[in-house]
Each structure stands twice: as structure tokens, then as C-alpha cells.
Amino acid sequence: MNRESAKQLVLTDRFGRTVDYVRIAVTSACNLRCTYCLKEDAPTQTQQLDVVETSKLIALLAGMGVRKIRFTGGEPLLHPSIPELVRIAKATPGIDTVCITTNGVLLDRQLDALVEAGLDGVNLSLDTLDREKFTSITRRDRFEQVSKALDRLLATPSLTVKLNTLMLRGINNDEIPAFVELTREHDLTVRFMELQPFDDHQIWRTGRFMGAERIRERLADAYPELEAITGHSTEHYSFSLPGHRGSIAIIPAFSRNFCSSCSKLRITADARLISCLYHHESIDLAPALKGEMNEVELKKRIIEAVQQKPKDGLKSSHDTAASSMSQIGG
């Protein structure tokens, strides 16, 4: 199938939303132990997607109308073949954009190979610009590696760069100005994010939750010259500042209202297809990827998952079990 014919196909759910974006967690392994995501003693046994099977899946999804692939984890750079996966995805007819979301620990050493493979964008998860806070949040002393990776990203004009900064009340909310300052000289988007309502709703027990409205108020108080702009569908608030090259966004996770424009599917490292971040019912793709069913049946499973997408993830999440972000893939 050539690129033009692939573009004629569209995946649509029962509410009329087009699904053209798939996040693939290539591994469940992670080299950090962020306090809001993984326990220090989290199991070391991990799942990892096979390159051949993943390539087959990407080609099939592209033929069904998927245009964007994002590799996640766990930590995707722990997958030994991540540059190859990027190259394969980028070369797949119908796929226009290939990105990764990473904690950045291994990014400096792999960045050249990823760019050469055709990577379009990087979302770097970075919650603090302070080394001591970084070690406290992640339980690992890897700040220097991540800081170097950020410098490299900002010096790579071919990449779309976004910082995902999870706001933790009483821990890093005082760093909002420091993160905003990065947008002055650099064409990146700093995205302040609410904690995700997973892990048995631990966010409420810790008292660290900082809502999107409170983040917006802090920004408005500090920067009265903020100008509202149109951002990505998940960026409920998006702003620019006069004299700044980059932009600022706020992403709700609990107080969200962007379900109506959701275009995503998620594939976990054990080959489960999840239609909604908050609705954890899944469809097992492993038998199909291992050749135990034909392509027609695999397509049926994907369409079934698309049709399972709930209209409102918030309502759906009340009735499903909690999972960690490392399991779901972000």
C-alpha cells in the first residue's frame, strides 16, 4: 500500500472521533523510581516488545489510518533496538510523525542515532531543575545525565522538543519561573502537568496534587502579560510570552475535559491494546503478533478496541482498577 492510498483510510470510534495516534510502550523497564509512579522495590521482571512484531503492528496500524507513533515505556531508551524501531516506523507508508517520551537518562548517548533514524520529536520528562530535588523525586542521582540531554535537545533544531513537568505541591511549584525562563531563548514547549489519578489514587494521600487551575493562577500572577494561544488538544491552557521563542502549556489529568478530542490508542509492553488512558480494559494482541491469527482477525481486534473507547474517561475511570503509568505507557 502506498502513502496516498493509506491516507484514505480512517479509524473512527462510535462517537465520531478519528483515531490516528498510537503510543507504543516498547518496554516496561525503567531506570528511575519516581515516587509518584513506581515503588523502590518494584519488580525487576519486565516485558519488552519484539522488533519484528512491533514492525508488523505499525504497518498494519498505518494501513488503518494511524499517522503518528510515539514510543514510550517504562523508559523506551532501555529497549536495545529503539533507533531501529524509530527508523522502521518513520519509513512505514502512512506514518508522518515519530516521537518518543523519555526520562532522558540515556538520551545523550543515543540522540545522534535517533535523529539519524528520522525521529521528529522528544518529550522529556523533567520535574525539577534542581539536582537534590531530582534525586528525591526519582530516587536516583541522574540529574547530570538528564541536564546534558536537555542541552543537546535544545541544540538540535530538527526536533520538536517538549518538557513534561509534573507539578508536585510543596516540592517543585516554586520552580515555575525557572521552567518558563527556558522558553525565552529556546523554541520548546514547557508543559505543566497534573498528577495522574493512578496507583490506588495515591495522589490524594500524599497531598502533593496541584490542579490545573491553581497552576494557571500561579502563571497568571507571575506573568500578567501571558497571551493565550491554541495548543495541542491535550493542552487545555496554552500561552506565549512576549519576547519568548517557546510556549507554555497546562495539561489536566484529573480535572481534564479533552476526552471529546482524544485520538489515541495505547499498546503496552506485553502487547495489550488499551483504548483509553483511564479505562483499563484491554485487548490482547500477542496471539495475533505471534502468528496465531491472521491479519483480518488482528484488524478486527484493533477495530474492537477503537469501538470500546469511552465517551468520557473520567466517568469510565471510576469503575476500573488502578494501574501505574509504567504499566500503561503514559
From Swiss-Prot:
* CDD domains (UniProt xref): Radical_SAM, Twitch_MoaA
Name one matching Pfam family.
Fer4_12
- Per the UniProt record, which EC number(s) apply here? 4.1.99.22
Q: Which InterPro entries match?
A: Aldolase_TIM (IPR013785), Elp3/MiaA/NifB-like_rSAM (IPR006638), MoaA (IPR013483), MoaA_NifB_PqqE_Fe-S-bd_CS (IPR000385), MoaA_twitch (IPR010505), MoCo_biosynth_MoaA/MoaC (IPR050105), rSAM (IPR007197)
This protein's UniProt keywords: 4Fe-4S, GTP-binding, Iron, Iron-sulfur, Lyase, Metal-binding, Molybdenum cofactor biosynthesis, Nucleotide-binding, S-adenosyl-L-methionine
Q: Lineage, please?
A: Bacteria, Pseudomonadati, Chlorobiota, Chlorobiia, Chlorobiales
Q: What name appears for this protein in its UniProt entry? A: GTP 3',8-cyclase
Record-level Gene Ontology MF annotations: 4 iron, 4 sulfur cluster binding; cyclic pyranopterin monophosphate synthase activity; GTP 3',8'-cyclase activity; GTP binding; metal ion binding; S-adenosyl-L-methionine binding
Describe the subunit structure: Monomer and homodimer.
Location of region: Disordered: 309-330
> Would you say which domain of life the source belongs to?
Bacteria
User: Which reaction does this chain catalyze?
Assistant: GTP + AH2 + S-adenosyl-L-methionine = (8S)-3',8-cyclo-7,8-dihydroguanosine 5'-triphosphate + 5'-deoxyadenosine + L-methionine + A + H(+)
Requisite cofactors: [4Fe-4S] cluster
Organism, as annotated:
Chlorobaculum tepidum (strain ATCC 49652 / DSM 12025 / NBRC 103806 / TLS) (Chlorobium tepidum)
Q: Where is the Radical SAM core domain?
A: 14-225
Name the pathway it acts in.
Answer: Cofactor biosynthesis; molybdopterin biosynthesis
- Where is S-adenosyl-L-methionine bound in this sequence? 36, 74, 125
Record: residues binding [4Fe-4S] cluster 2: 259, 262, 276
